[in-house]
């Protein structure tokens, strides 16, 4: 049985791509290209989990393919191909959810200062939603 934070009131984002603002401004096509490649990799792993696991095993032979396939299946079902992603495409965020996450982190980690969701997420580098839909 799996206990999910989101099922228990902690609806935080679990993964993010971070980029230095100066780098992004100076190299927008590199950032866009990286994000397109990331979406392609996730799309491929959702479409063919066994091939996704094989790609990981090629880089880390100590892993167990059966366990990794089970783990990827769980991740795809619970964290990657979510209802929000199905509707909006991979890589975008719900700004209200992100704002609430920031507030939760401020309280739990004792952070101070005003941080808006728009301060930490910029969708301008994402491909159009139609190009970010998972299979």
Where are the regions that the model predicts?
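Helix N-cap / beta->alpha transition motif
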Residues: 4, 20, 94, 122-126
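Short Pro/Gly-enriched coil loops immediately N-terminal to beta-strands
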Residues: 5-13
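Small-molecule pocket liners
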Residues: 1, 13-17, 21-22
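Secondary-structure end/capping motifs
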Residues: 26-110
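Ligand-binding "clamshell"
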Residues: 1-6, 68-70
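Short, catalytically relevant binding-site loops at active-site mouths
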Residues: 9-10, 23-24, 41
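Residue-level signal for pocket-adjacent positions within structured domains
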Residues: 12, 18, 85-88, 106, ...
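Conserved C-terminal helix/tail region of periplasmic/extracytoplasmic solute-binding proteins
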Residues: 98-135
């Amino acid at each position: 049985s799996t206990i999910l934070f989101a099922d228990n009131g902690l609806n935080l984002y679990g993964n993010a791509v971070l980029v230095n603002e100066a780098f992004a401004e100076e190299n927008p096509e590199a950032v866009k290209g990286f994000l397109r490649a990331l979406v392609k990799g996730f799309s491929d792993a959702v479409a063919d989990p066994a091939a996704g696991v094989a790609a990981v095993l090629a880089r880390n032979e100590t892993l167990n393919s059966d366990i990794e396939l089970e783990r990827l299946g769980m991740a795809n079902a619970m964290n990657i191909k979510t209802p929000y992603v199905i509707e909006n495409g991979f890589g975008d965020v719900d700004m209200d959810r992100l704002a609430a996450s920031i507030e939760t982190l401020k309280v739990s980690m004792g952070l101070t200062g005003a941080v808006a969701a728009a301060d930490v997420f910029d969708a301008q580098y994402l491909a159009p939603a139609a190009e970010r839909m998972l299979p």
